[in-house]
Structure formats: structure tokens, C-alpha cells
């Protein structure tokens, strides 16, 4: 079916081509095979004890399962979750039933614990494989997928910092999908300024605490999708240090548990209201009061909470979850950009309009709009953004596997440092440029893209959250330039630049087009090093950080150019010809590899040059924004 006029069903993914499966417009399995098996060599991880029970076949089975669940249970209600968002009814959240039905199916697959230890009910899959599998769910319905992914972050934090009893009590039910999780940081008066959090936690004789305060912007903070919600809450124990050093982390369940783990009384956590959002509408976003006295455990006000680890270590513990969440944000942004690209590509191949410039005969049939150069430009830009972003997300997944399982402790430390350095980039670059891909997907659809008859406008609205939550674009920029680039004497930045330079050296030796692109990338690496030195040589942090967002964007573009050069080298290895050649596997493989080459060319010719103007402004220590005054606006 070709949706050239609005009609019922044109908003569904099936509308793009009745002969294609829903999953064909979520993510590209061919691209995932290339990234996992031809570039990142994921099967080699099965040589390590943690992953010894797995094989490429089990990896493919997991991808098949995730793709099927996404297509059959998540995608069908994506539009309904957007148009019929959750509401508060009698103090309880009501939402469309398809959300819980889909999450029950997902819980039954065991995928929520895909990369967790078998001892807590997990599958012990490599993180790079689980990241690829989860991409299907995020592409199909990012708001429904948010509930288990928030839960996954909670569970991983407690595995890292919780006691054995806390793991048994709370993590196992989360892995089983019976309990879900939320992360409660922000407060109405504090926003992103965690130093200004005022929620207090009063110690009790039994070792627990009673929490009093208000939390804002809490995704998944209340719903009826699971038996219980495990809130992880930052709060202050009276008498602690001021600022972020005085924050402690607490487990605050929505429903208290008995000694045997059975559900008991309601905790003193109250839903005040829901925030109504531009996108991500199927995910509840809540204002919660802790200790209001509506529910009175043991006859007293105060939300019962259990300290995680030691007092005043809450921020460090929460950043364990935050770093994971930030990479997850980048993964979600990538998935939304990717599905938008595939849908606009399918539309462009089917939508007839216009004729070639050389043929003005009105009796000649119109051509599909994919034949027009400007449409190809928009599609190629999207391809370069989303496939570059997916490579970056999966590369980070591979680094996490190295950090956890590399035989050499030095390799583990190196992977940890490199992942730490890449985290703000992996969060921010896909959030900015896969959103730009969604914008182009709308443009490819023309006027129809601006209507709700097609999915692409919703993808843009959903994706617009990603530059904001889990640390805004500006906060990531300050983190990269103000902390990551200078920590340990610049060790993280040095490692990143050395790693990129190693790829440049390999490409030089490969000769041909790879060597040509390597020269460009090598020059860009030198700009990063020189610009960073110049900024901090001023001795003025305010001046050095005034244009931190430009630094983040420039370094991000260089990193994604690196991802494209890595992919080009993998294509060369697969085809056996640095200058391009036929590949085993027939015409489909040949077209795939040719598309990779062309996308790499596009990124180096159209995108990497963008960094020059940014580096020039940074090198010039431009004060335009710093010197601007409030009264001049």
C-alpha cells in the first residue's frame, strides 16, 4: 500500500509497504550483522568464561526474539500510547491496556536480565548483543520500552552497591519483571542542580529511614504495570555535609514488603500529578511527594527507605546508574532516528512525484521521489547519522564487555577509561543528530510528514526529549570539557585520541580511499588536542567553558567520523578490496557495502568539515556569549 493520501492505517508501519514486515522499518538486521560480526567480532567474546555458554547462533536467536516482540507487541500500540496518554483517575494512573500486555510478554522472554549474572536470573549475554537487541524495542515503542530500561538501571545499580539482602529482596523481582524501578533525583526548586536537593531522610531505630520531600520529572514514578515500584531516591541525612557531598541514596518501595518478601502496606509515597509532554507520552512522568502522611506505615508519616551502601555516597552511586542511563539515552535516540530513516526511505521508494530534469514529457510516468538528488541527499544524511550513531552505541557496549571480562586488568582499566570519556558524547551526539535525522525524515515525507497519518512526526517529538533528560546537552558539554578532558592529567582524552590515531594508522596502511579519509581524520584529531590545550591555557575556567557545547559537537563529529572510518576498514576486509570490490553473497551484499562506502564519503565530505568553524571559534577564545548581558536581550 502506498500512502499518497491520508487514509486509515497510513500511520502504521505496515502502511509503508504492505509486503514488508513491521520489523523491516525498525532497524536493519543486515547492518546489525555487519556491526556485530564483521566489525566488532562479538562471537569472539564467547571464548571468555562469562560468555562461554553462548555462540553466534544464540546471539541471533536473541535478536530474532527481540525483533519479534518489538514488531508484534510494542509497535502496534505506539500510536495509541501517544494519543491516549496516561491519566490520573482516583489517585491511580490509568493507561491503555496494551502497554501492560506488551511488558508482560517482554518479562516472559527474560530479556530484561539479558546481560546480568545467571545467579540473579540473567542470561549473561554480552552487553554489545543486548544493546543491539534492545534497539528493536526502542525503535518500535520508546515510551513502553522506557519502563523496563529504567528498571534495568536500578537493578544494575543495586548489584553494584546494594547489600546481598537488598539484591535478593529487590533485584530478583526486577529481573523477573514483577517490580519496576524509577530514579528520583530532581526536585521542583533544584532541577539539574543536585547540590540544592532538600529531601531529608531521618534515621529510625530499626536502621531504616523516613523520607520527606518532593521529587519532580520522575519517569515511571507511578503506574499499575507491576506489583511494585522500587524508587531510588537521593536525600539528605540530617547533620551531613552541604551540597552534593551530603547526598545519600535510598531504596523506597511503593509497597512495603514483609520479612518473606510478600507485599504489605502502601509506603508514604503519593502521586501528586503527571506532567503532560510533547512526546514520550506513554511513559508516565510524575511529581511525587514522600512523607506527606497520606499513607502512614506503622501509623506514622514518612516514606520508609533503606540506605544503599554508606551515608553521603549517594551521588557517586547514582552516577553508576546515570552513566548507564546516558548511554541508554543515546541508544534510544539512535533507534528513533534509525526507524525514521527506514520509514522515509520506504516512503521515498514508493511515492511517485515529478520527472527527471531531462524529461519534461507529461505523458511519461512520474518517478519515485528517491530518484531526485535532493531527496537522496536527505536520505544519505540520515543514513550517515543513524548508522554512525549505532556504531558508536555498539562500540560502547563492546567496551563495557571489555571492562568486565578482558583477561588483562590493564585492558579492563583502559576500556573503563575510554568508556567514561565517550559517555557524554554517546549521550549527546545521537540525541542531536538522530533528532536531525528525524527532521529530515519529516521533510522527505513532505506535507504528509507534518501530519499524524505517518509515524515520523511522532518520532521527532519522542526524540526531542533526549537532548534534555539524564543531563542536558549543556551539562554533557561541561562534563566533557570541564571534567573528562582534564581528569588525571588528561589521561582519558589522551587515550581517546591515541585510539582514534591507531585507526588512522591502519587506514594509512590500507591505502586507497581509506588513506584519503585517514588524512582528514588525523588532522581533526590534532585539532582536538590543540584546542583543548589552548582553552585550558587561559587559566580562566569561565572563558574555557563558555563555548563548551561547540567543543562537544566538534569532538562528537570527530568521534563519529572515526566510527565511519572503522566501518570502511571493515568493508574493505569483507570485500577484499580497499578501492571497492564485489563481495561474496551476491548483489544484496554488494549494494550494502557500496552504501556503507557512500555514507562514509558523505560524512567526511559534508559533516566532518563542520568541525573547522567550531574549532576556529574555540581556538580564538571567542567571548561573544560570555560577554552578553541580560539587559541586552
Model regions and ranges:
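Amphipathic, small/basic residue-rich leader segments at the start of a protein or domain
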Residues: 13-145, 169, 616-617, 623-633
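Alpha-helix capping/hinge segments and adjacent helical runs
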Residues: 23-26, 203, 280, 395, ...
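Internal maturation/activation junctions in enzymes
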Residues: 86, 147-151, 162-204, 397-416, ...
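Conserved phosphate/anionic-ligand binding catalytic regions in large, soluble enzymes, centered on
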Residues: 115-126, 143-145, 330-337, 432-451, ...
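A structural-propensity feature for long, helix-poor, extended segments
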Residues: 152-154, 163-166, 170, 470-472, ...
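A short core secondary-structure module
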Residues: 208, 212-266
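A glycine-rich, basic-preceded beta-loop-alpha segment at the flavin cofactor/substrate interface
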Residues: 217, 257-272, 277, 287-325, ...
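C-terminal amphipathic alpha-helical interaction region
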Residues: 487, 503-633
Amino acid at each position: 500500500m502506498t500512502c499518497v493520501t491520508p487514509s486509515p492505517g497510513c500511520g502504521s508501519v505496515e502502511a509503508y509497504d504492505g509486503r514488508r514486515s513491521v520489523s523491516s522499518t525498525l532497524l536493519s538486521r543486515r547492518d546489525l550483522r555487519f556491526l556485530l560480526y564483521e566489525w566488532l567480532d562479538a562471537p569472539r567474546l564467547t571464548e571468555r568464561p562469562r560468555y562461554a555458554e553462548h555462540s553466534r547462533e544464540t546471539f541471533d536467536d536473541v535478536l530474532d526474539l527481540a525483533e519479534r516482540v518489538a514488531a508484534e507487541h510494542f509497535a502496534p500500540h505506539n500510536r495509541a500510547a501517544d494519543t491516549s496518554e496516561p491519566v490520573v483517575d482516583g489517585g491511580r494512573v490509568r493507561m491503555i491496556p496494551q502497554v501492560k500486555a506488551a511488558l508482560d510478554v517482554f518479562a516472559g522472554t527474560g530479556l530484561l536480565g539479558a546481560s546480568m549474572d545467571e545467579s540473579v536470573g540473567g542470561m549473561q549475554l554480552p552487553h554489545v548483543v543486548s544493546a543491539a537487541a534492545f534497539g528493536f524495542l526502542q525503535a518500535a515503542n520508546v515510551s513502553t520500552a522506557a519502563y523496563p530500561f529504567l528498571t534495568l538501571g536500578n537493578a544494575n545499580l543495586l548489584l553494584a552497591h546494594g547489600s546481598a539482602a537488598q539484591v535478593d529482596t529487590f533485584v530478583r523481582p526486577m529481573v523477573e519483571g514483577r517490580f519496576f524501578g524509577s530514579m528520583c533525583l530532581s526536585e521542583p526548586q533544584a532541577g539539574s542542580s543536585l547540590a540544592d536537593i532538600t529531601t531529608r531522610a531521618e534515621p529510625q531505630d530499626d536502621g531504616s529511614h523516613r523520607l520527606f520531600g518532593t521529587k519532580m520529572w520522575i519517569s515511571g514514578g507511578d503506574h499499575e504495570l507491576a506489583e511494585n515500584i522500587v524508587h531510588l531516591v537521593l536525600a539528605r541525612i540530617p547533620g551531613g555535609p552541604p551540597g552534593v557531598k551530603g547526598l545519600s541514596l535510598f531504596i523506597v518501595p511503593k509497597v512495603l514488603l514483609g520479612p518473606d518478601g510478600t507485599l504489605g502496606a502502601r509506603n508514604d509515597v503519593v502521586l501528586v500529578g503527571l506532567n503532560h509532554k510533547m512526546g514520550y507520552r506513554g511513559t508516565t512522568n510524575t511529581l511525587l511527594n514522600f512523607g506527606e502522611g497520606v499513607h502512614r506505615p506503622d501509623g506514622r508519616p514518612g516514606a520508609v527507605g533503606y540506605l544503599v551502601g554508606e551515608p553521603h555516597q549517594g551521588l557517586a552511586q547514582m552516577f553508576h546508574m546515570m552513566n548507564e542511563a546516558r548511554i541508554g539515552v543515546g541508544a534510544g535516540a539512535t533507534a528513533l532516528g534509525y526507524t525514521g530513516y527506514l520509514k522515509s526511505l520506504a516512503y521515498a521508494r514508493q511515492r511517485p512525484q515529478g520527472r527527471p530534469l531531462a524529461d519534461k514529457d507529461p505523458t511519461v510516468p512520474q518517478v519515485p521521489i528517491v530518484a531526485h538528488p535532493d531527496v537522496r541527499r536527505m536520505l544519505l544524511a540520515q543514513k550517515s547519522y543513524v548508522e554512525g550513531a549505532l556504531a558508536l552505541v555498539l562500540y560502547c557496549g563492546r567496551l563495557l564487555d571489555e571492562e568486565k571480562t578482558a583477561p588483562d586488568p590493564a585492558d579492563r582499566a583502559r576500556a573503563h577509561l575510554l568508556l567514561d570519556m565517550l559517555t557524554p558524547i554517546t549521550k549527546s551526539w545521537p540525541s542531536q543528530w538522530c533528532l536531525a535525522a528525524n527532521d529530515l525524515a519529516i521533510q522527505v515525507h513532505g506535507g504528509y510528514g507534518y501530519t499524524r497519518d505517518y509515524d515520523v512526526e511522532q518520532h521527532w517529538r519522542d526524540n526531542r526529549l533526549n537532548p534534555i533528560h539524564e543531563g542536558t546537552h549543556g551539562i554533557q558539554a561541561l562534563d566533557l570539557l570541564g571534567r573528562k578532558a582534564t581528569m588525571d592529567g588528561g589521561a582519558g582524552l589522551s587515550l581517546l585520541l591515541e585510539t582514534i590515531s591507531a585507526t588512522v594508522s591502519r587506514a594509512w596502511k590500507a591505502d586507497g580511499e581509506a588513506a584519503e579519509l585517514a588524512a582528514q581524520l588525523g588532522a581533526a584529531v590534532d585539532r582536538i588536542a590543540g584546542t583543548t590545550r589552548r582553552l585550558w591555557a587561559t587559566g580562566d575556567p569561565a572563558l574555557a567553558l563558555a563555548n563548551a557545547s561547540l567543543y562537544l559537537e566538534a569532538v562528537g563529529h570527530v568521534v563519529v567520523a572515526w566510527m565511519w572510518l572503522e566501518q570502511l576498514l571493515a568493508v574493505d576486509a569483507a570485500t577484499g578490496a580497499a578501492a571497492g570490490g564485489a563481495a561474496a553473497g551476491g548483489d544484496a551484499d554488494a549494494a550494502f557495502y557500496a552504501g556503507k562506502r557512500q555514507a562514509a564519503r558523505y560524512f567526511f565530505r559534508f559533516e566532518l568539515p563542520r568541525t573547522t568553524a567550531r574549532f576556529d571559534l574555540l581556538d580564538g577564545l571567542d567571548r561573544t556569549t560570555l560577554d552578553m548581558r541580560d539587559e541586552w536581550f
